[in-house]
């Protein structure tokens, strides 16, 4: 049976994912050794976790697929947010480097605008936490310029950016 274990975990992860049990799906996906599907699940569900205040869970998931953060810009952005929300402020900028590299060589699309807005918002949050009002305002304004109203996660970040502008 040991040879069948990865396949059983893979099947369980698909079932859990299809039935809305994301945490269980990711746990089984990681146990199956399917890093690519784990990354996809994390990218697809990371924003919801952050909006529910589960930044620590998100950080644990991202650390389980650490090798992919360099090649997946959204994973890098989620990692930066997880660091910020868990108080690891000194690790936020380095987490954003892969996303910076990706976006600098990408065509402007809705996806890249959301990424740029998310990066500006986490930088605004970081500057605000450090008491740098000038940088917080600049990044918050930048975030508002990129983030669309029609995407739920982007709306949350727009609210954060607006709040930072009100605090500064």
Which sequence ranges carry the predicted segments?
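Alpha-solenoid helical repeat architecture
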Residues: 21-23, 35-36, 71-74, 107-118, ...
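Short, glycine- and charge-enriched coil/turn segments that flank and shape catalytic ligand pockets
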Residues: 1-4, 104-110
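Tandem amphipathic alpha-helical repeat scaffolds
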Residues: 39-48, 74-89, 115-132, 156-168
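Short alpha-helical linear motifs
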Residues: 51-54, 63-67, 82-86, 99-102, ...
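Extended alpha-helical scaffolding segments used for macromolecular assembly and cargo binding
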Residues: 2-76, 82
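Residue-level detection of beta-strand scaffold positions
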Residues: 13, 29, 76-78, 92, ...
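Hydrophobic core segments within long, regular secondary-structure runs in both alpha-
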Residues: 6, 10-13, 39, 55-63, ...
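Amphipathic alpha-helical segments of tetratricopeptide repeats
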Residues: 26, 46-47, 59-63, 67, ...
